[in-house]
Curated annotation (Swiss-Prot):
Protein name stated in the entry: Large ribosomal subunit protein bL28
Disulfide partners: none
HAMAP family, per the entry: Ribosomal_bL28
Membrane-crossing segments per the record: none
Upper lineage: Bacteria, Pseudomonadati, Pseudomonadota, Gammaproteobacteria, Chromatiales
The keyword Lyase is assigned to this record: no
Length: 78
């Protein structure tokens, strides 16, 4: 499964580890993803999403029904 947030689209980015001596080695910065279950009252079922912490805040703000409508409009199966 790809490390991508289903709501925000956040994905891993690349950068450098920088030591005290300023040596640089390549690394990946991974998004803070969590698999989370949401109860959707209108559908009377649970929906499992892989979302970042930012995505969780978006759901708190807009509501799960509005977010699911946006996902379905984008063509994602939920």
């Amino acid at each position: 499964m790809a490390r991508v947030c289903q709501i925000t689209g956040k994905r891993p980015v690349t950068g450098n580890n920088v030591s005290h001596a300023h040596n640089k080695t390549r690394r990946r910065f991974l998004p803070n993803l969590h698999s989370h279950r949401f109860w959707v009252e209108s559908e009377n079922r649970w929906v499992r999403l892989r979302i970042s912490s930012k995505g969780l805040r978006i759901i708190d703000k807009k509501g799960i029904d509005a977010v699911l409508a946006d996902l379905r409009a984008r063509g994602e199966k939920v």
